[in-house]
């Protein structure tokens, strides 16, 4: 029996050779491989396949998956494929062909009476996003991020304190303890960074032992060469990452001074273009060094006609500046440069900038990391055309490059890729389902540790789940003991070894960070280009390997107003 491609796609989702448009962008992906078997597809529903003795076997719970996501289109750094995905004990157990092995050939994911089904037909499945630049200013950020498709948040803070409004530091053991205890309340993987600004090791060591998974160097606390050197030395000793916001005013040295203080050691440079802070005007040079793991924050993603004006206002508020003081205004204006922001777009498209994060409520929007990543990809396709690595008539490589910026690469950078960051067997089942028309903007379903934590949901008093008002609501994995079983709190190996989780009475599952200190830019997937960057100190023009980097600001963007009328 044969059916048309259109009929097949309507029933089981796209298959090899079919193309899917991502939201209202000009980005098209093409299915590279289909792990399901034609004629043996499984689908749930009345008169469908997953019924007793048909697609559902007699196997016991230990032999079947807890949940199967059927016929999903996976977009991940490793491929764009159609598959069934099996989840077991909170992790991804298999990617392949689901069904009843007693009556169906080639089954790699057994379905039984103990299996739940999530219909992935016509849906896109991605790993949950990882945001590594979080100012924990208010707890409401966490729900906002979760509903956007982010499932891991890394950063620091203590609430709306003046220090937290500007810097991602949970300063000291007492604050770390309180924030780790608070993390138990949220269906989100959370890791905290301590304050890294000190010239002697002991104040930093005690924070790592208190649970910090990294240390943050910020110019507002004094990012001097001495503090940089000391912080990296402690990080090397305890296998935690260092994130840095460098010296915008060049008070304690220039970009070359800071790069020298790194001494070749691994470091995550925040907002490496500089509008979010850093050596003016040439911190962008840092993206050309193998030990530097560069990221952007999302307000400059992508460069638009509103970017410059918006940033000046943001900066005055976030860094406690006074518009009536000439020196404060000059400080703000030195950080916001059209030329370097335009270059940042292109450096992302070339794979020289490796990650995108938010800078939540501190010159960044916590719910827009994913949207702005894909807006940047779309802008670059329109302005620069297909990438040389893309296939005929598709944007598959570009899609893999950009999705890696907020999934696997932040995970590698911060030593958590053994747990999260991709749709791969063995990883924690933090997964997001999207309708293609809403991809990157409004997810349909967010899973944490294999259970549904958030979803679009209609009127709870309706006779079916879909009547309006439809909006995002927490689901059962956001409550009670289920929350503790399906979300992770990341801590340092030193804190785990000392029994910190037990001492603090932490309830969520605990995971440790590891392998942070030997990461190089070449380890960051699809985003490992090391250009030689030159910035003209007068015009701010940026060249990479001698080529001028300039693009016009966007007048309009996809994934914008038309999605937020309701």
UniProtKB/Swiss-Prot annotation:
Carboxylation allows a single lysine to coordinate two nickel ions. The keyword Nucleotide-binding does not apply. The active site is at 319 (proton donor). CDD domains: Urease_alpha (cd00375). It is found in: Cytoplasm. Keywords: Cytoplasm, Hydrolase, Metal-binding, Nickel. It is an enzyme of class 3 (hydrolase). Pathway: Nitrogen metabolism; urea degradation; CO(2) and NH(3) from urea (urease route): step 1/1. Its main location: cytoplasm. Binds 2 nickel ions per subunit. Pfam families: Amidohydro_1, Urease_alpha. The modification N6-carboxylysine is found at residue 216. Its cofactor is Ni cation. It catalyses: urea + 2 H2O + H(+) = hydrogencarbonate + 2 NH4(+). The keyword Isomerase does not apply. One of its GO terms (biological process) is urea catabolic process. Substrate binds at residue 218. Its EC number is 3.5.1.5. GO terms for cellular component: cytoplasm. Residues 128-566 form the Urease domain. Ni(2+) 1 binds at residues 133, 135, 216, 359. PANTHER family: UREASE. Belongs to the metallo-dependent hydrolases superfamily. Urease alpha subunit family. NCBIfam families: PRK13206.1 (NF009685), PRK13207.1 (NF009686), urease_alph (TIGR01792). Heterotrimer of UreA (gamma), UreB (beta) and UreC (alpha) subunits. Three heterotrimers associate to form the active enzyme. This is Urease subunit alpha. It comes from Pseudomonas fluorescens (strain Pf0-1). The lineage of its organism: Bacteria, Pseudomonadati, Pseudomonadota, Gammaproteobacteria, Pseudomonadales.
């Amino acid at each position: 029996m044969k059916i048309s491609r259109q009929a097949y796609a309507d029933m089981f989702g796209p298959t090899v050779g079919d193309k899917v448009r991502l939201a209202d962008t000009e980005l098209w992906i093409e299915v590279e491989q289909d792990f399901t078997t034609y004629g043996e597809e499984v689908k749930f529903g009345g008169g469908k396949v997953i019924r007793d003795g048909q697609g559902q076997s007699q196997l016991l719970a230990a032999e079947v998956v807890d949940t199967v996501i059927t016929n999903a289109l996976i977009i991940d750094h490793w491929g764009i494929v159609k598959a069934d995905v099996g989840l077991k004990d909170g992790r991804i157990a298999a990617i392949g062909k689901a069904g009843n092995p007693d009556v169906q050939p080639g089954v790699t994911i057994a379905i039984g009476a103990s299996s739940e089904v999530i219909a992935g037909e016509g849906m896109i499945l991605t790993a949950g996003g990882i945001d590594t630049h979080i100012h924990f200013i208010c707890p409401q950020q966490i729900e906002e991020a979760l509903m956007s498709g982010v499932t891991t948040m890394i950063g620091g803070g203590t609430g709306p304190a003046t220090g937290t409004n500007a810097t991602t530091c949970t300063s000291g053991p007492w604050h770390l303890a309180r924030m780790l205890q608070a993390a138990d309340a949220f269906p989100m993987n959370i890791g905290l960074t301590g304050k890294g600004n000190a010239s002697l090791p002991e104040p930093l060591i005690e924070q790592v032992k208190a649970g910090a998974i990294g240390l943050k160097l910020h110019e507002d606390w004094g990012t001097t060469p001495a503090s940089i050197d000391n912080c990296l030395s402690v990080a090397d000793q305890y296998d935690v990452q260092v994130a840095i916001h460098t010296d915008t005013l060049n008070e304690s040295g220039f970009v070359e001074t800071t790069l020298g203080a790194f001494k070749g050691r691994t470091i995550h440079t925040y907002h490496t273009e500089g509008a979010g802070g850093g050596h003016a005007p040439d911190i962008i040079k840092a993206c050309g060094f193998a030990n530097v793991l560069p990221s952007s924050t999302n307000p400059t993603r992508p460069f638009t006609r509103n970017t410059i004006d918006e940033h000046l206002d943001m900066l005055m508020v976030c860094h406690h500046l006074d518009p009536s003081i000439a020196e404060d205004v000059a400080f703000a204006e030195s950080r916001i440069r059209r030329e370097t922001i335009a270059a940042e777009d292109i450096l992302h498209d070339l794979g020289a900038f490796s990650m995108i994060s938010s800078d939540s409520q501190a010159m960044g929007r916590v719910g827009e990391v994913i949207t702005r990543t894909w807006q940047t990809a779309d802008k670059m396709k329109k302005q620069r055309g297909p990438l040389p690595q893309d296939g005929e008539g598709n944007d598959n490589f570009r899609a893999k490059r950009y999705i890696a910026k907020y999934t696997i690469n932040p995970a590698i950078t911060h030593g958590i890729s053994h747990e999260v960051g991709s749709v791969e067997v063995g990883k924690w089942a933090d997964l997001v389902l999207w309708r293609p028309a809403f991809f990157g903007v409004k997810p349909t379903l967010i899973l944490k540790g294999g259970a549904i934590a958030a979803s679009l949901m209609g009127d709870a008093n309706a006779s079916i789940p879909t009547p309006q008002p439809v909006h995002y609501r927490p689901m059962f994995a956001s409550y009670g003991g289920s929350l503790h079983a399906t979300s992770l709190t990341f801590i340092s190996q030193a804190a785990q070894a000392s029994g910190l989780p037990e001492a603090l009475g932490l309830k969520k599952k605990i995971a440790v960070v590891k392998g942070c200190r030997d990461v190089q830019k070449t380890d960051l997937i699809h985003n490992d280009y090391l250009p030689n960057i030159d910035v003209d100190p007068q015009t701010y023009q940026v060249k990479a390997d001698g080529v001028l980097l300039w693009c016009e600001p966007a007048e309009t963007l996809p994934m914008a107003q038309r999605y937020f009328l309701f």
